[in-house]
Amino acid sequence: MLALNNYLIISAILFSIGTIGVLVRRNAIVIFMCVEMMLNAVNLTFIAFSKYLGNIDGQIFVFFVMTVAAAEAAVGLALMIAFFKNRESIDVEDVNIMKW
C-alpha cells in the first residue's frame, strides 16, 4: 500500500508533464491531451486525499471533474474539427480567427 506522499508525487509529476506539454507543444490535439492529463493529475490528488482522510467527498468531486472533462472533450474536439475544415491545420499558431 502506497503512502499519501507517493500519490502526491505521482500526481505532481503528471501535472508537470501536462503543464510542459501545454506550454511547449503547437498541435492543438496534443495540447488538449495535456490539459486532460492535468485534470487527471488533480483527480488523482482528490482520490489520494479522500482515501487518506477516510471520507468520500474527494471521490464525489472526481465524478464532477470527470463530467466537466467529458463536456470539455466534446466541445473541444468539435471546435478542432470545425477549425480543421476551415483552415486544414490544427496548429495553434494558425489560430488567428479572433483577430480584428
From Swiss-Prot:
Matching entries from InterPro entries are given as:
NADH_UbQ_OxRdtase_chain4L/K (IPR001133), NUOK/Mnh_C1-like (IPR039428)
Question: What highest taxon heads this organism's lineage?
Answer: Bacteria
By its UniProt entry, which PANTHER family does this protein fall under?
Answer: NADH DEHYDROGENASE SUBUNIT 4L-RELATED, NADH-UBIQUINONE OXIDOREDUCTASE SUBUNIT ND4L
Recorded family membership: Belongs to the complex I subunit 4L family.
HAMAP family referenced in this protein's UniProt entry, alphabetically:
NDH1_NuoK (MF_01456)
Q: Give the location in the cell.
A: Cell inner membrane
Q: How does it sit in the membrane?
A: Multi-pass membrane protein
Q: Name one Pfam family in it.
A: Oxidored_q2
Biological process GO terms, please?
Answer: ATP synthesis coupled electron transport
Which residues are listed as membrane-spanning?
4-24, 29-49, 60-80
Cellular compartments per GO CC = NADH dehydrogenase complex; plasma membrane
According to its UniProt record, the EC number is 7.1.1.-
Does Translocase count among this protein's keywords?
A: yes
Top EC class for this record: translocase
| Gene Ontology MF terms | NADH:ubiquinone reductase (non-electrogenic) activity; quinone binding
What is the recorded name of this protein?
NADH-quinone oxidoreductase subunit K 1
Tell me, in one coarse class, where this protein mainly resides: membrane
Enzymatic reactions: a quinone + NADH + 5 H(+)(in) = a quinol + NAD(+) + 4 H(+)(out)
Question: What does the UniProt keyword field contain?
Answer: Cell inner membrane, Cell membrane, Membrane, NAD, Quinone, Translocase, Transmembrane, Transmembrane helix, Transport, Ubiquinone
What is the role of this chain? NDH-1 shuttles electrons from NADH, via FMN and iron-sulfur (Fe-S) centers, to quinones in the respiratory chain. The immediate electron acceptor for the enzyme in this species is believed to be ubiquinone. Couples the redox reaction to proton translocation (for every two electrons transferred, four hydrogen ions are translocated across the cytoplasmic membrane), and thus conserves the redox energy in a proton gradient.
Q: How does it assemble?
A: NDH-1 is composed of 14 different subunits. Subunits NuoA, H, J, K, L, M, N constitute the membrane sector of the complex.
Work out whether the entry's keyword set contains Transport. Answer: yes
